[in-house]
Amino acid sequence: MAKVTNNRNRKPRKKVCILSAKGIEHVDYKDVELLQRFINNNNKIASRRVTGASARMQRRIANAIKRARFVGLLPYVKE
């Protein structure tokens, strides 16, 4: 019979931010491909828990997404 493992004792793996892993310091609002990674299916900004970003990078990401939406590069709502 197979041995059943208990996953409750394991610590969850810490998510690594895509930006810090690539060494990106500045988040540009014109880089739509990068910003779309931080938006979920309903075009909402993903939380830090989902993205694994630090507080500072999450603020920069959110501001860049808001600027891109204002300029018209990203949609506000799902089509």
UniProtKB/Swiss-Prot annotation:
Single GO MF annotation: small ribosomal subunit rRNA binding
InterPro entries, A to Z: Ribosomal_bS18, Ribosomal_bS18_sf
GO annotation terms (biological process): translation
Coiled coil start-end: none
This protein's UniProt keywords: Ribonucleoprotein, Ribosomal protein, RNA-binding, rRNA-binding
SUPFAM superfamilies: Ribosomal protein S18
One GO CC annotation: cytosolic small ribosomal subunit
A Pfam family it matches: Ribosomal_S18
Record function comment: Binds as a heterodimer with protein bS6 to the central domain of the 16S rRNA, where it helps stabilize the platform of the 30S subunit.
UniProt xrefs under PANTHER family: 30S RIBOSOMAL PROTEIN S18, SMALL RIBOSOMAL SUBUNIT PROTEIN BS18M
Protein name: Small ribosomal subunit protein bS18
The organism of origin for this protein: Ureaplasma parvum serovar 3 (strain ATCC 700970)
Encoding gene (name): rpsR
